[in-house]
Swiss-Prot record:
It comes from Rhodococcus opacus (strain B4). This is 3-isopropylmalate dehydrogenase. It catalyses: (2R,3S)-3-isopropylmalate + NAD(+) = 4-methyl-2-oxopentanoate + CO2 + NADH. Catalyzes the oxidation of 3-carboxy-2-hydroxy-4-methylpentanoate (3-isopropylmalate) to 3-carboxy-4-methyl-2-oxopentanoate. The product decarboxylates to 4-methyl-2 oxopentanoate. InterPro entries: ICDH/IPMDH, IsoCit/isopropylmalate_DH_CS, IsoPropMal-DH-like_dom, LeuB_actb. GO terms for biological process: L-leucine biosynthetic process. GO terms for molecular function: 3-isopropylmalate dehydrogenase activity; magnesium ion binding; NAD binding.
Amino acid sequence: MKLAVIPGDGIGVEVTAEALKVLRKLVPDLETTEYDLGARRYNATGELLPDADLAAIREHDAILLGAIGDPSVTPGVLERGLLLNMRFALDHHVNLRPSQLYPGSKSPLAAQPDIDFVVVREGTEGPYTGNGGAIRVGTPHEIATEVSINTWFGAERVVRYAFALAQTRRKHVTLIHKTNVLSNAGAIWTRAVETVSAEYPDVETAYCHIDAATIYMVTDPSRFDVIVTDNLFGDIITDLAGAVTGGIGLAASGNIDASGTNPSMFEPVHGSAPDIAGQGIADPTAAILSAALLLRHLGRDGDAARIETAVEADLASRGDSKVVTSEVGDRIAAAL
């Protein structure tokens, strides 16, 4: 297995080291190439994602990312120039966000044992394509636009991914949108679900407005199995999903090219947390769960399940003890 590793900034370096520790336990022939991308390189050279690095990254089976971001860089520079650029260049059209309540979780819904759903978010369209602008800036007549791009091709392939995933789970897909107001984009998404669902007669479907979905995710999260939604609504609902299941510190994610043409990227949802970087107290659990997602994406379901079982046992045994980054990685690796 050839793995491109982007530790990134802040605690990304520390948590990635623990994820690699776990991966190497299960994949002895793992070949890794590290890429220095993020705030440090940008501050030193002005480079964000050089063409040579992108071309080299394409030659790997998958990508493991730590975290990107630093107070020394203007907000938005790294996000647009590195993360979004990579997402579009590698056609990571599926953003996959599992949301499971683990034992010992600090979730406010910890008393509800059956929280286990996945959000499938479209990753390359919507209002995040940069299709907008502003005129008369600084005047009372300033106008700003952000155009949301929705295509049949983009919606259908993400919906198809969601149905295939649901068939391996509880066989239920919920489309989340705002079709009563966003009627043009909503029509594409609704027809995509109707079209693909005809090929999966054993998968039930449901629809939920985004505002109602935020209520149900708190009051009745077990109603969800696989959620499919667009880029903007997915961006919002996945953070709520993280809070419901104990916080984004435990949240793993995958940025996936479902066609397999490009390597997919896996990363913890949490940020670079520069305030605790270098102290050895960052929880690497989300990075380790991201490694499990990576293995499952590459067809190593058994190894992924072993990691998830070890993580579940580790979380259940922690109690109120303080997290030491390397010790968490050691315990989970030893449990394999």
